[in-house]
């Protein structure tokens, strides 16, 4: 009997108590509640950057098109080197659609272009999470280089951010 009690006393108890485990879970919850919104904001901003880059790339292609066809711009994306363009084919990671608008097009309704010119608009895909971005809903640029954005953030915030 004495031998058993000597063995038990020489081996300390191992493991975590319930309180220690609850403290760790509480700390992890606090860290996640801070980290996840920050991460989502970062992701949202990177997708905005992708949309702005696509709009500016397409505007550059329009200007190159005009240099070889000096009479008019085009609203046909295939003429600009884009294939698979349209409502069923979002650009980049798949969060935005690009639209090329001529003066006769009403798709770029907030800022329709004047004649002869163009306007390019990136709008979020309705089924993607970027459609919930209320600050910067859509991005557009016209043939004069003027940039526009819709959403609560406004043009200066959305194009500067």
PLM feature spans:
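N-terminal leader/signal peptides at the extreme start of proteins
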Residues: 1-16
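Periplasmic/extracellular, small/polar-rich flexible segments of pilin-like filament-forming proteins
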Residues: 2, 67-161
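Residues at secondary-structure transition points
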Residues: 13, 45-49, 53, 109-113, ...
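Internal alpha-helical transmembrane segments of multi-pass membrane proteins, especially GPCRs
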Residues: 14, 19-23, 44
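Alpha-helical hydrophobic helix detector
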Residues: 21-38
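Alpha-helix exit/C-cap motif
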Residues: 45-49, 57-79
């Amino acid at each position: 009997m004495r031998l058993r009690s000597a063995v038990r006393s020489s081996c300390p108890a191992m493991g975590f108590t319930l309180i220690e485990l609850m403290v760790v879970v509480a700390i992890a919850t606090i860290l996640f509640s801070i980290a996840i919104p920050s991460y989502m904001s970062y992701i949202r901003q990177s997708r905005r950057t992708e949309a702005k880059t696509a709009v500016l790339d397409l505007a550059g292609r329009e200007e190159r098109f005009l240099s070889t066809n000096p009479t008019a711009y085009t609203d046909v994306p295939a003429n600009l080197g884009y294939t698979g363009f349209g409502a069923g084919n979002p650009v980049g990671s798949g969060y935005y659609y690009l639209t090329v608008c001529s003066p006769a097009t009403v798709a770029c309704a907030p800022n329709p272009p004047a004649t002869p010119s163009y306007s390019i608009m990136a709008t979020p895909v309705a089924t993607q999470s970027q459609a919930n971005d209320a600050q910067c809903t859509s991005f557009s640029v016209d043939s004069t280089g003027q940039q526009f954005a819709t959403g609560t953030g406004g043009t200066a915030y959305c194009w500067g951010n």
